[in-house]
UniProtKB/Swiss-Prot annotation:
Residues 220-376 form the TrmE-type G domain. GTP binds at residues 230-235, 249-255, 274-277. (6S)-5-formyl-5,6,7,8-tetrahydrofolate binds at residues 23, 85, 124, 457. GO terms for molecular function: GTP binding; GTPase activity; metal ion binding. This is tRNA modification GTPase MnmE. It comes from Nitratidesulfovibrio vulgaris (strain ATCC 29579 / DSM 644 / CCUG 34227 / NCIMB 8303 / VKM B-1760 / Hildenborough) (Desulfovibrio vulgaris). Keywords: Cytoplasm, GTP-binding, Hydrolase, Magnesium, Metal-binding, Nucleotide-binding, Potassium, tRNA processing. Binds 1 potassium ion per subunit. Its cofactor is K(+). SUPFAM superfamilies: P-loop containing nucleoside triphosphate hydrolases.
Length: 457
């Protein structure tokens, strides 16, 4: 991919809206803008940097839209390059026409994430900040936004950089010990060396643990409604959503395919999935639905095992509970309004449970509270703290690699392995930390990261 030409893309969501923005970045961005822009004021004397100008975008003699346009010279721009923006009306036809005109006058269509990639390549941000751009856009909750903002501010990259600097200092001392063995290097005494290695390793481990603690706040959690047919799973989904989303009938097996909807529980974003009832069936379509239900249960952060309170837990439900594990299951006794004075069914030891009547809404508020607490417990998450750093899966994997290498290095030091060989391990740990911030990340990995971005970002 070329990185020194001029690119253009629609930077706002597609569809109809009041405003749509075309972003142009690269050495010819001002020339492209000048070729298309016709000012509305006779006093227009050229584009003043960072100033919006009113006018018309024309393609030849054909006026396309009434716009505001701005030019921002590099390097103090998002990409570090010269950047121009055209603020149009937000119709998809208008935006497509203006973008095509930009391409005809010297720009090319931007690839996914190419603006942010250029910002990274031009040193405007490290890779943790670049990834945080996409994480901020996709943040499912205010807490997720705060976690992404901390990375956008560079806090994760700074913490990783500080740990790597400590390893660099150790590497320098190793080099001195190897090159000048007759010199006394006091700080390279095995005890002091091991203490510093362990301190850095502990810092790396603590950073990596932030992924597990915050994953559900960053990505949301998958909560699956499962159970036998006619247990009231679809009614419960509708009650939780506060609207009729799933079809509800008295016929067993009404739900065959799974339905997934987003739900925000006091800042915790979940993906709520209603699944086909678990039973043996000769219907091929329903069989596939049951198979998909079992797959979703295996993937779920939390399973809401919905059972008819008038029947209690039956064999298939107990089997699901055994396979999923009680730590990932919240038993929901539904239809409590039909008990008519009978004793509430018991819950197996070690299981959490809640009682509701989805048809009337009784107990749903308590269920919402229970779901939120159960998700946090099942994922090992807690309420995000001020200054919490939340690496994503890729970053956590690189941190784990660094921690493993440092652990191996400590073993080498205890075994009196020569310093030059220890230096190889130290280089590996430094390289793993550099992967977090993108200083040594292969091009193929960068391609994969930025391919997940939207076009125009």
């Amino acid at each position: 991919m070329q990185h020194d030409d001029t690119i253009a893309a629609i930077a706002t969501p597609l569809g109809q809206g009041g405003i749509g923005i075309i972003r142009i970045s690269g050495p010819a961005s001002l020339e492209v803008l000048r070729a298309l822009f016709r000012p509305s004021s006779s006093r227009f004397g050229g584009f003043r940097p960072w100033t919006l100008h009113h006018g018309t975008i024309t393609d030849g003699c054909d006026p396309l839209d009434d716009v505001l346009a701005v030019h921002m010279p590099g390097p103090r721009t998002f990409t570090g390059e010269d950047v121009s923006e055209i603020h149009c009306h937000g119709g998809s036809g208008v935006l497509a026409a203006v973008l095509e005109a930009c391409v005809r006058h010297g720009a090319r269509y931007a690839e996914r994430g190419e603006f942010t990639r250029r910002a990274f390549l031009n040193g405007r941000m490290d890779l943790t900040q670049a990834e945080a751009v996409a994480e901020m856009i996709a943040a499912p909750s205010r807490e997720g936004m705060r976690l992404a903002q901390a990375k956008l501010d560079g806090l994760l990259g700074q913490r990783v950089g500080a740990l790597r600097a400590r390893l660099d200092a150790l590497r320098m001392q190793l080099c001195v010990a190897v090159d000048f063995p007759e010199e006394e290097v006091e700080c390279l005494a095995p005890e002091a060396f091991l203490a510093e290695i362990e301190a850095v390793r502990q810092g790396v481990v603590e950073l990596s643990a932030g992924y597990a603690r915050t994953r559900c706040w960053q990505d949301g959690a998958l909560v699956v409604l499962a159970g036998q047919v006619n247990a009231g799973k679809s009614s419960l989904m509708n009650a939780l959503l506060g609207r009729r989303r799933a079809i509800v009938t008295d016929l067993p097996g009404t739900t065959r395919d799974f339905i997934e909807e987003p739900l925000n529980l006091s800042g915790l974003a979940i993906r709520l999935a209603d699944t086909a009832g678990l039973r043996e069936t000769g219907d091929i379509v329903e069989q596939e639905g049951v198979r998909m239900s079992r797959d979703l249960v295996a993937q779920a952060d939390l399973v809401l095992l919905v059972t008819d309170a008038t029947q209690g837990l039956q064999g298939p439900e107990l089997e699901l509970l055994r396979h999923a594990g009680p730590e990932r299951v919240l038993v929901v006794f539904n239809k409590t309004d039909l008990l008519e004075g009978r004793i509430l069914p018991s819950t197996p030891e070690g299981c959490r449970s809640v009682h509701v009547a989805a048809a009337s809404g009784d107990g749903v508020e308590s269920l919402v509270t229970a779901i939120r607490a159960a998700v946090l417990a099942a994922t090992g998450a807690g309420e995000p703290e001020a200054g919490e750093l939340a690496p994503n899966m890729r970053q956590a994997a690189a941190l784990d690699k660094a921690a493993t290498i440092l652990d191996e290095l400590a073993g080498d030091i205890r075994a009196h392995v020569p310093y030059d060989l220890c230096g190889v391990r130290l280089d590996g740990a430094c390289a793993a930390l550099m992967d977090v911030t993108g200083q040594s990340t292969p091009e193929a990995i960068l391609d994969a990261i930025f391919a997940s971005f939207c076009i125009g970002k």
